[in-house]
Amino acid sequence: MKTYLEIKVPIYYSAPWFSELRKALKDMPVLWQKGYYHITLAFVDDTQHLPDVEAIMHKYLDHAHPVNITFDKLDVFTAGNGMKIVHLGTNNIPKGLQTLVDDIRHDISCTNSNIQSDFKLHVTLGRISEPETNIEDVGFLIDEIDFMPFTLTLNEVEYRVFRGRSIYKSTLK
């Protein structure tokens, strides 16, 4: 069973910087995400021993604190499947968040579950699936945007079946 742990990011499709990004990439074949913005902390491709994994969520997240992140960049990268991901990111991952993610991912891997990829802090804003789209062209257009950094407090986490039911939810306090 595929599962994932995410932390929700309260941004809006209507935000001025997001509108400017969509306008800059209007001639690119981007499929924009129109809601449900989050950072995936762990994508577990083959979840073994679900009760053990759920216990890990309680161990680390029941008493975790909210995280402040300053988002200071818009960028694009190529995912393992070849899709280009237009995203919001940061140059400074908070140490506490990185430690939390590392600890959770380590403990999940000890359950013989297969974590699909390394942690790369980003919020997916759009996807380009056409392989002929040049990533450098997309990056150049993104670089032209006058993007002002902003800080958000993230406090809502959810562990769920991929495209399915929620297994664990917590509001960090």
Spans of features found by a protein language model:
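Histidine-dependent nucleotide/RNA phosphoesterase domain, centered on the 2H-phosphoesterase fold
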Residues: 1-173
